[in-house]
Amino acid sequence: MAEVGLEGNQPVDLSKHPSGIVPTLQNIVSTVNLDCKLDLKAIALQARNAEYNPKRFAAVIMRIREPKTTALIFASGKMVCTGAKSEQSSKLAARKYARIIQKLGFDAKFKDFKIQNIVGSCDVKFPIRLEGLAYSHGAFSSYEPELFPGLIYRMKQPKIVLLIFVSGKIVLTGAKVRDETYTAFENIYPVLTEFRKNQQ
């Protein structure tokens, strides 16, 4: 059964996903500029979903339930939002955090919203010979099983880092748009099938 992304149970568009597998988006990291100076102590005291420990980290950590995300809010007005599962959810969450800051009396705007990183994952459902892959794709691969069980594959085009595990599970990170995630997976899929482990 091919994995299907956010489309629910619609069939996979094979013109876009020839492998029949659509990587699932797991985490979106976005940034926005609230474009005003913030008093982090005041925010932490007034907002019930916020924590601030300046000795540990120079930002307020705020969480909301819907979309389930975490924001890092800096005194400069810069904000990082993590944890959303889609670009739209990430933007919606960032807007919600901006509104919370506005309600606390700050003149927060919503400038330069940008998706910085998309993390996706999928499962090719067959085991992979990582040693062989690392050997034949040495220029792009680093594989040191004593340090980390996955092979790290740095694709040049699109510029995506893939973590490839012997089990056939794949993590893709570094995309700014979801199509880069999809393209990177379609690029690597024939390589993975080439290094498929024959099960005895």
UniProtKB/Swiss-Prot annotation:
GO terms for molecular function: DNA binding; RNA polymerase II general transcription initiation factor activity. Gene3D superfamilies: TATA-Binding Protein. Keywords: DNA-binding, Nucleus, Repeat, Transcription. SUPFAM superfamilies: TATA-box binding protein-like. One of its GO terms (cellular component) is nucleus. CDD domains: TBP_eukaryotes. Its main location: nucleus. InterPro entries: TBP, TBP_CS, TBP_dom_sf, TBP_eukaryotic. GO terms for biological process: DNA-templated transcription initiation. It is found in: Nucleus. Sequence repeats lie at residues 25-101, 115-192. HAMAP family: TATA_bind_prot_arch. Belongs to the TBP family. This is TATA-box-binding protein.
